[in-house]
């Protein structure tokens, strides 16, 4: 079904079964597969491929060369009825690739709202991305990666499968992210090590100086204490019940995960 207000270049191929919403714009030489849903006001520039069981949210804009909704690159996957869901008002720049999920792991790759994907970034199968995230050029997310709201990943950084990146974390360019990154953490290097807190991001998010000071103290207690990271975090939790960002860090550490925790020290992982 194609809405009457949609504007589609005659050189583009729209397969039967595709749903094209109101005021959608599709430029030249695009391919839209039969199981694709483009919500209202989506804009697709030239030479874009959207295939698979893919839904693109209202107002999202996709630039030339992007391939959205291709099968998982997992060697053991089954693509039957798997999906990719992209939220509203995302910007997907040149050459970006996003894959559908795998049957074995829930079947869905999910991307939230207001995200920015710069050129040649990659979102693999079964990833879960929140809102207001930035993936800079050539960022690579392996399968099953979780990225929370307002995280920023610098150019060329690579994230190991099943890794979690917490809210408003900052990943430096060319970093290798092999382990979970706490909310508000900054990670740099290869191997990636924590280098402190994303204080600039916390300030921009409206946290006052006293709150940031408490979160810094919490960070030191976690990573400079005598016990393991998880033991240190559990021991101080009651001190921070009234400090939301610190409590978020502590709960992130306590949560079950397939990966260990990034730290400032190569020898401490959990």
From Swiss-Prot:
GO cellular component, one term: membrane
Biological pathway: Glycolipid biosynthesis; lipid IV(A) biosynthesis; lipid IV(A) from (3R)-3-hydroxytetradecanoyl-[acyl-carrier-protein] and UDP-N-acetyl-alpha-D-glucosamine: step 1/6
Similarity remark: Belongs to the transferase hexapeptide repeat family. LpxA subfamily.
Swiss-Prot/TrEMBL GO biological process terms: lipid A biosynthetic process
Name used for this protein in its record: Acyl-[acyl-carrier-protein]--UDP-N-acetylglucosamine O-acyltransferase
Molecular-function GO terms, alphabetical: acyl-[acyl-carrier-protein]-UDP-N-acetylglucosamine O-acyltransferase activity
Pfam families in the cross-refs: Acetyltransf_11, Hexapep
Function: Involved in the biosynthesis of lipid A, a phosphorylated glycolipid that anchors the lipopolysaccharide to the outer membrane of the cell.
Lineage: Bacteria, Pseudomonadati, Pseudomonadota, Alphaproteobacteria, Hyphomicrobiales
Localization of this protein: Cytoplasm
Keyword list, A-Z: Acyltransferase, Cytoplasm, Lipid A biosynthesis, Lipid biosynthesis, Lipid metabolism, Repeat, Transferase
Subunit structure, interactors included: Homotrimer.
TM annotation in the entry: none
Catalyzed reactions per annotation: a (3R)-hydroxyacyl-[ACP] + UDP-N-acetyl-alpha-D-glucosamine = a UDP-3-O-[(3R)-3-hydroxyacyl]-N-acetyl-alpha-D-glucosamine + holo-[ACP]
EC number(s) reported in the record: 2.3.1.129
């Amino acid at each position: 079904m194609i809405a009457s207000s949609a504007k589609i270049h005659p050189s583009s191929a729209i397969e039967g079964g595709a749903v094209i919403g109101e005021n959608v714009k599709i430029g030249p030489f695009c391919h839209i597969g039969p199981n694709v849903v483009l919500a209202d006001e989506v804009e697709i520039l030239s030479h874009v491929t959207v295939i698979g069981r893919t839904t693109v949210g209202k107002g999202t804009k996709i630039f030339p060369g992007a391939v959205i909704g291709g099968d998982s690159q997992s060697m053991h996957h089954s693509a039957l009825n798997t999906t990719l869901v992209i939220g509203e008002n995302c910007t997907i720049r040149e050459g970006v690739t996003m894959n559908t999920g795998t049957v074995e792991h829930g079947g869905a790759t999910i991307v939230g709202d207001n995200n920015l994907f710069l050129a040649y970034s990659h979102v693999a199968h079964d990833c879960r991305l929140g809102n207001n995230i930035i993936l800079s050029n050539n960022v690579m997310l392996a399968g099953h990666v979780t990225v929370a709201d307002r995280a920023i990943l610098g150019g060329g950084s690579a994230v190991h499968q099943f890794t979690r990146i917490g809210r408003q974390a900052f990943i430096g360019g060319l970093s290798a992210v092999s382990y979970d990154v706490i909310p508000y953490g900054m990670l740099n290097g290869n191997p990636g090590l924590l280098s402190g807190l994303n204080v600039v991001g916390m300030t921009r998010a409206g946290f006052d100086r006293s709150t940031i000071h408490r979160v810094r103290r919490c960070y030191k207690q976690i990573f400079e204490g005598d016990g393991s990271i998880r033991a240190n975090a559990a021991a101080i939790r009651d001190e921070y019940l009234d400090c939301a960002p610190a409590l978020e860090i502590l709960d992130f550490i306590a949560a079950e995960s397939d990966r260990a925790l990034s730290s400032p020290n190569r020898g401490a992982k959990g």
